[in-house]
Amino acid sequence: YVALALWMTKYYVQEYGFNLQTAALLAACFSLPGGVLRAAGGWMSDKWGAHSVTWWVMWVSWICLFLLSYPQTEMVIQTVNGPQNLSIGLNATMFTVLIFIVGIAFAFGKASVFKYISDDFPQNIGAVSGIVGLAGGMGGFILPIMFGALVDITGVRSSAFMLMYGVVWVSLIWMYFSEVRKTPMMGQGANSPVSKAS
C-alpha cells in the first residue's frame, strides 16, 4: 500500500502527462479509501473472519492488478481491407477506477491482517504487530526502488503493477495451500453467508 501510494503521482505524470497537482489529486483515489475504509475492513473481519476477508481481498487485487499491469500496446492487424491499427491499454479514467478498487481492497486487507494477529497470536499481539509494521515499512521503502529498477530494465511503466501482480499471485497460492482448504469459504461456520444459503 505505502509503495503504491508513493508511486502513483509519478506514474500519472509520466504515463498520462498530467501536471503534478492533477496527478496528486488522482493518486488520492488510491490513498484515501486505503486509509478511510480500514474500519469497514475490521468490521468485515470480525463478522466473517480474517482468513475469508483476506482471501477475497487477494482475488479482487489479483484481477485489478492483472488489468493494471497490461502495458499500453499498439498493434497493426493485416486485414483484407489493408492494415488496421489497434490500441490496447487503459485510459486515465479506467486506470483511476481500478486503482480506487485496489485501494478499497487494500484497506480491507490491512484490517484483516491485524485481525489475524489477534486470532492467531493472542499472547504476543504487541510483538507480532511490531514485526508486521516492520514488514510494511520495509515494503514501503524497498518496493519503490524495485519499481524504478523494473522501469529502467524493461522500459515499461506498468511493470510496477506486474511485480505486484506476481506478489499477489504467489500469496494466493500460498494462502490456498496453507489455509483455504482448511476453512469454510466465507467465514466461520454458521456466520458465513454461504453456509446460510446452503
Residue ranges with predicted function:
Residues 116-126:
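Paired intracellular helix-loop junctions of major facilitator superfamily
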Residues 31-39, 137-141:
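Residue-level signature of mid-helix packing/kink "hotspots" within the transmembrane helices
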Residues 37-49, 151-152:
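Helix-to-loop junctions at the C-terminal end of transmembrane segments
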Residues 1-35:
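Extracytoplasmic gate region of multi-pass secondary transporters
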Residues 149-166:
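A membrane-interface helix-boundary motif in multi-pass transporters
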Residues 124-154:
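A late C-terminal transmembrane helix in Major Facilitator Superfamily
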